[in-house]
């Protein structure tokens, strides 16, 4: 017994040291992603020693569902029976449907169609589904336990919302959501529409149903989440200048926010999207190559230069983890760009990653903040 434990400890320690010591240039090597049986999973990178404790060395990335056209808005519903498997819903926006992954059966099926191009989803404190319908209807709705749909917001100051995108519910039952332009910009994820709002805002719906614009100076706000103590609000500015960013705000007792501070700045080729905060305050961020034309001029002879991209999609697609101070500490490499995440599983330690066409899962040594 002692010998076996010592061997396991040695293997784990060696793997930890190797992962920490591995040069970050390994991320720049092209690869063919294949779910593997090797422990530890070579697609989970420790960028800082502080991330080592979150990595489970006998856990590998699994593809638990596929066949979507753009996966977004994962939300987990725990079982009513403590410790039992629950299920996860995820938006397949272009196909105008919600998909369902059942943890008990491992089946991935269509949950509901004609969902008004649902994007972000969350669960309120009463266990009800709250959804951003980001095209056509352009509203935030709640699905009651009997299946009835309640409209929570579809306009502000007499003008239609743009395209509600991502959403979070605070412990005081207020609902906070972002309202960029994505859902009305074309036909792929709904129908082209006209913006009636002068700005792209972050809104708060209080318990009485009153809607307030709490942030009005972000261009196309996207992912949104609170810190574990709810004293900070984090919001992605998807069209930030010069780069996409996550901004931090202090949350005041009256429901307003203040002290806008840039927490995370994506590089010129990186894309921040949806994200989740764990109980330690780390931000697990959907990440990927943004398709930008930033390039390096390379001499190819004859006085000619080729402009080669500074990054490859396969170097960047996945989940990037930052600590509460904005330092990158970990990276989970995926074969598809990750748009959004959710902590699920009976112990809330299974990280679900909605990524382009597929849904991936990885057990981690962490829990979601909510």
For the regions a protein language model found, what residue spans apply to each?
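Beta-rich, blade/repeat-based domains predominating
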Residues: 66-85, 114-133, 139, 157-175, ...
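A short beta-strand motif characteristic of beta-propeller blades
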Residues: 62-65, 107-112, 150-156, 211-215, ...
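Short, conserved, GDST-rich strand-edge loop motifs in beta-rich repeat architectures
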Residues: 35, 178-196, 289-312
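Asp-box/WD-like beta-propeller blade repeats and closely related beta-sheet repeat scaffolds
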Residues: 141-174, 178-185, 190
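Short loop/turn segments that connect beta-strands within beta-propeller blades
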Residues: 102-106, 144-147, 206-209, 252-253, ...
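N-terminal secretory signal peptides and thylakoid transit peptides that target proteins
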Residues: 2-18
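A short loop-to-beta-strand structural motif that recurs across blades of beta-propeller domains
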Residues: 97-99, 139-141, 201-203, 245-247, ...
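Blade/loop signatures of beta-propeller domains
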Residues: 31-59
